[in-house]
Amino acid sequence: MRVHEEILKQQKIPKSLVGKRIWEDRLADIAHFEDYLGRQGVIVLKFFLNVSREQQKKRFMKRLNTPEKNWKFSASDVHERQFWGDYMLAYEEAIGATATKHAPWFVVPANNKWFTRLVVSAAIVEAVEWLIDRFRLPCAGVVRTC
């Protein structure tokens, strides 16, 4: 999830909703909705790709120094880096408030893209295999499943 500050500022949130508990209430709503989905049989997998500050800086520099990657870079990226600690606290709070049995978070080290892809793929494969096993019907007249 990436929140663009400039987009967030344009949101038309009714003033009556913007109170001291706006984020706590929203996180609770998210957790309740995801629990509802889980009880309905929907598999909810959430991944937080945890890139270190140093790795993020390397990637930003590569985007600046590689013309075909310039489109990925925004000046707001430089400005937002000063709030790294605030973002980490917000992520920690959001993950803690919305991690449930029905909708777990996978906090994945993401400095090495190959490792990140491996971990995410493995979690998805495991969920799909669970679904296949859950909905597999027994073959007629045979003890084993198809």
Task: List the model feature ranges, each with a label.
Residues 36-40, 97-100:
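Arginine/glycine-rich "motif VI" loop of SF2 helicases in the C-terminal RecA-like domain
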Residues 2-27, 37-89, 136-143:
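A glycine- and Lys/Arg-enriched "phosphate-lid" helix/loop adjacent to the NTP-binding pocket
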Residues 87-146:
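NTP-dependent small-molecule kinase module
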